[in-house]
Amino acid sequence: SNFTYSVQQNAGSVTPPAGYTNYLGATVTASNSSISSGTAIGLRHKIEGYNIADLAWGTSSAKSVTLSFWVYSSLTGTFGGALWNSSQALSYPFSYSIPQTNTWTYVTLNIAGPTSSTWVTNNGTGVGIDFSLGTGTTRLPYSK
Protein backbone atom coordinates (compact mmCIF):
# COMPACT_ATOMS: atom_id res chain seq x y z
CA SER A 1 0.00 0.00 0.00
CA ASN A 2 1.17 3.56 0.72
CA PHE A 3 2.89 5.56 3.38
CA THR A 4 1.98 8.84 5.00
CA TYR A 5 4.25 11.70 5.89
CA SER A 6 4.17 15.16 7.40
CA VAL A 7 5.94 18.23 6.06
CA GLN A 8 6.97 21.07 8.32
CA GLN A 9 9.62 23.68 8.96
CA ASN A 10 12.55 22.27 10.96
CA ALA A 11 11.09 18.76 11.29
CA GLY A 12 12.31 16.75 14.25
CA SER A 13 15.41 17.79 16.12
CA VAL A 14 17.74 18.09 13.11
CA THR A 15 19.96 21.18 13.18
CA PRO A 16 19.87 23.11 9.86
CA PRO A 17 23.05 23.22 7.75
CA ALA A 18 25.64 25.86 8.71
CA GLY A 19 24.51 29.33 7.69
CA TYR A 20 20.81 28.44 7.62
CA THR A 21 18.11 29.03 10.21
CA ASN A 22 15.35 26.84 8.74
CA TYR A 23 14.68 23.98 6.36
CA LEU A 24 11.65 22.15 4.96
CA GLY A 25 11.49 18.65 6.40
CA ALA A 26 9.39 15.62 5.47
CA THR A 27 8.98 12.89 8.08
CA VAL A 28 7.40 9.50 7.36
CA THR A 29 4.64 8.96 9.93
CA ALA A 30 3.40 5.54 8.79
CA SER A 31 5.04 3.19 6.35
CA ASN A 32 4.35 -0.01 4.54
CA SER A 33 6.76 -2.22 2.65
CA SER A 34 5.50 -1.09 -0.76
CA ILE A 35 3.96 1.82 -2.62
CA SER A 36 1.07 1.24 -5.05
CA SER A 37 2.47 0.63 -8.54
CA GLY A 38 1.28 3.86 -10.20
CA THR A 39 1.85 6.18 -7.25
CA ALA A 40 4.35 9.04 -7.03
CA ILE A 41 4.85 10.85 -3.73
CA GLY A 42 6.94 13.96 -3.36
CA LEU A 43 7.47 17.63 -2.64
CA ARG A 44 6.60 20.24 -5.29
CA HIS A 45 7.67 23.87 -5.65
CA LYS A 46 6.38 26.21 -8.38
CA ILE A 47 8.39 29.23 -9.59
CA GLU A 48 6.47 32.14 -11.10
CA GLY A 49 7.07 32.78 -14.80
CA TYR A 50 8.25 36.36 -14.24
CA ASN A 51 11.18 34.91 -12.28
CA ILE A 52 12.39 32.76 -15.18
CA ALA A 53 11.62 35.04 -18.14
CA ASP A 54 15.28 36.07 -18.52
CA LEU A 55 16.29 32.41 -18.97
CA ALA A 56 14.70 32.44 -22.47
CA TRP A 57 13.71 28.80 -22.12
CA GLY A 58 11.93 27.42 -25.16
CA THR A 59 14.13 29.50 -27.51
CA SER A 60 17.49 28.99 -29.22
CA SER A 61 18.95 31.44 -26.66
CA ALA A 62 17.98 29.31 -23.63
CA LYS A 63 20.33 29.78 -20.67
CA SER A 64 21.60 26.99 -18.45
CA VAL A 65 20.93 27.04 -14.71
CA THR A 66 22.36 25.44 -11.60
CA LEU A 67 20.02 23.83 -9.08
CA SER A 68 21.66 23.43 -5.69
CA PHE A 69 20.22 22.33 -2.37
CA TRP A 70 21.03 20.67 0.93
CA VAL A 71 19.56 17.24 1.68
CA TYR A 72 19.43 15.21 4.91
CA SER A 73 18.09 11.68 5.14
CA SER A 74 18.01 8.61 7.33
CA LEU A 75 18.52 6.61 4.10
CA THR A 76 21.42 6.43 1.66
CA GLY A 77 21.08 5.87 -2.06
CA THR A 78 20.09 7.55 -5.29
CA PHE A 79 17.09 9.84 -5.23
CA GLY A 80 15.42 11.90 -7.94
CA GLY A 81 13.07 14.56 -9.09
CA ALA A 82 12.35 16.76 -12.09
CA LEU A 83 12.03 20.29 -13.38
CA TRP A 84 8.97 20.73 -15.61
CA ASN A 85 7.06 23.34 -17.61
CA SER A 86 3.51 24.41 -16.75
CA SER A 87 1.88 22.12 -19.32
CA GLN A 88 4.10 19.27 -18.08
CA ALA A 89 4.81 18.53 -21.75
CA LEU A 90 8.54 18.73 -21.06
CA SER A 91 10.49 17.74 -17.98
CA TYR A 92 14.10 17.36 -16.98
CA PRO A 93 14.42 14.37 -14.64
CA PHE A 94 17.43 14.47 -12.35
CA SER A 95 19.02 12.20 -9.78
CA TYR A 96 21.39 12.76 -6.89
CA SER A 97 23.13 10.63 -4.29
CA ILE A 98 22.93 10.67 -0.53
CA PRO A 99 26.15 8.90 0.52
CA GLN A 100 25.79 9.09 4.31
CA THR A 101 22.83 8.91 6.69
CA ASN A 102 21.87 11.68 9.07
CA THR A 103 24.33 14.17 7.57
CA TRP A 104 23.63 17.26 5.48
CA THR A 105 24.84 16.78 1.88
CA TYR A 106 25.12 19.67 -0.58
CA VAL A 107 23.90 18.78 -4.08
CA THR A 108 24.65 20.80 -7.22
CA LEU A 109 23.04 19.97 -10.58
CA ASN A 110 23.81 21.77 -13.86
CA ILE A 111 20.81 21.94 -16.18
CA ALA A 112 21.09 22.86 -19.85
CA GLY A 113 18.53 25.44 -20.93
CA PRO A 114 15.71 23.70 -22.83
CA THR A 115 15.30 25.07 -26.35
CA SER A 116 11.90 23.50 -26.98
CA SER A 117 8.38 23.58 -25.55
CA THR A 118 6.55 26.53 -23.98
CA TRP A 119 7.70 28.10 -20.72
CA VAL A 120 5.32 30.56 -19.05
CA THR A 121 6.82 34.04 -18.45
CA ASN A 122 3.88 35.72 -16.69
CA ASN A 123 2.41 35.23 -13.21
CA GLY A 124 1.65 31.55 -13.89
CA THR A 125 3.94 28.63 -13.15
CA GLY A 126 7.13 29.16 -15.15
CA VAL A 127 8.90 26.06 -13.91
CA GLY A 128 8.08 23.45 -11.32
CA ILE A 129 10.52 21.45 -9.24
CA ASP A 130 9.57 18.06 -7.84
CA PHE A 131 11.55 16.01 -5.34
CA SER A 132 10.52 12.36 -5.23
CA LEU A 133 9.91 10.74 -1.85
CA GLY A 134 8.85 7.44 -3.38
CA THR A 135 7.41 5.90 -6.53
CA GLY A 136 5.63 2.72 -7.42
CA THR A 137 7.06 0.07 -9.74
CA THR A 138 5.27 1.31 -12.88
CA ARG A 139 5.95 5.00 -12.35
CA LEU A 140 9.16 6.83 -13.13
CA PRO A 141 9.87 9.62 -10.66
CA TYR A 142 8.19 12.65 -12.20
CA SER A 143 9.38 12.17 -15.77
CA LYS A 144 7.37 12.79 -18.91
Tell where the protein language model's regions lie, with residue ranges.
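Extracellular and organelle-lumenal recognition/adhesion modules and their flexible linkers in secreted
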Residues: S1-K144
